[in-house]
From Swiss-Prot:
Reactions the enzyme catalyzes: a ribonucleoside 5'-phosphate + H2O = a ribonucleoside + phosphate; a ribonucleoside 3'-phosphate + H2O = a ribonucleoside + phosphate; [phosphate](n) + H2O = [phosphate](n-1) + phosphate + H(+)
Name recorded for this polypeptide: 5'/3'-nucleotidase SurE
Matching NCBIfam families: PRK00346.1-1, PRK00346.1-3, PRK00346.1-4, surE
Binding residues for a divalent metal cation: D9, D10, S40, N93
SUPFAM superfamilies named in the record: SurE-like
EC number: 3.1.3.5, 3.1.3.6, 3.6.1.11
Annotated GO MF terms: 3'-nucleotidase activity; 5'-nucleotidase activity; exopolyphosphatase activity; metal ion binding; nucleotide binding
Keywords per UniProt: Cytoplasm, Hydrolase, Metal-binding, Nucleotide-binding
Gene: surE
Top-level taxonomy: Bacteria, Pseudomonadati, Pseudomonadota, Gammaproteobacteria, Enterobacterales
Keyword Cell membrane appears in the UniProt entry: no
Species of the source: Yersinia pseudotuberculosis serotype O:1b (strain IP 31758)
Length: 254
């Protein structure tokens, strides 16, 4: 039986992770290690300045108090799940993680930590807040396929599912990340003492949503699978930077 470490960024009681856990437990051994509260947008934050406490629920699920998604996967792999998992799954997120969203996403970060620690990893997001059962069914189908025929790319699979009944899903597309215009909105309010409070506004509008992007696939009713990698090196820019450095006086005598 496949062993799955399951986490998220919406918190342990969120409907997405609970729906997915129920579906996965029909054919897998599942250990939930998830934040005790919503940590959306936490990205790859790792808690290094304080100790982490856990709460083990009656069903064996583990909530990490004030933990980030990355904390949860780190603890799950290195301390809390024994034997260790075969794969790390993050989700189901309430809302998509498309394009530049992956930079901020705690859902993607949890999967990224799993991959960084040497495990196959999936991040699963629903483009809405209704059909979690659809996203769970898609995830189960993919995991069963991975059991039959492992995918040895060393990459994270970022999966985004349209918020539709399963019967209306048109298929699956392998995509690239689209892009958004930079977000610029900030909302300012005042508390009762007259102190300013700031709220970060919505993400920027899409500007690269071409037919091969994750944006386009989900909008057209397809499941989007985007391979992501931990290595952030821009290999195609290395020669450009080398040439620039050779034509400047930066790398001279110190």
């Amino acid at each position: 039986m496949i062993r799955i470490l399951l986490s998220n960024d919406d918190g342990i009681s969120a409907p997405g992770i609970q729906t997915l856990a129920s579906a996965l437990r029909e054919f897998a051994q599942v250990q939930i290690v998830a934040p005790d509260r919503n940590r959306s947008g936490a990205s790859n934050a790792l808690t290094l300045d304080s100790a982490l406490r856990i709460t083990t629920l009656s069903n064996g699920d583990i909530a990490v108090q004030q933990g980030t998604p990355t904390d949860c996967v780190y603890l799950g792999v290195n301390a809390l799940m024994r034997p260790r998992p075969d794969i790390v799954v993050s989700g189901i997120n309430a809302g998509p993680n498309l394009g530049d969203d992956v930079i901020y996403s705690g859902t993607v970060a949890a999967a990224m930590e799993g991959r960084h620690l040497g495990y196959p990893a999936l991040a699963v997001s629903l483009n809405g807040h209704q059909h979690y059962d659809t996203a769970a069914a898609v995830t189960c189908r993919l995991l069963r396929a991975l059991q039959r025929k492992p995918l040895r790319t060393g990459k994270i699979l970022n999966i985004n599912v349209p918020d539709l009944p399963l019967s209306e899903i048109k298929g699956i597309r392998v995509t690239r990340c689209g892009s958004r215009h930079p977000a610029e909105q900030v909302f300012c309010q005042q508390d009762p003492r007259g102190q300013d409070l700031y709220w970060i506004g919505p993400p920027g509008e899409k500007y690269d949503a071409g037919p091969d992007t994750d944006f386009a696939a989900v909008e057209q009713g397809y499941v989007s699978i985007t391979p992501l990698q931990v290595d952030l090196t821009a290999y195609t820019a290395q020669e450009v930077v080398e040439s620039w450095l050779a034509n400047t006086e930066v790398d001279g005598e110190w």
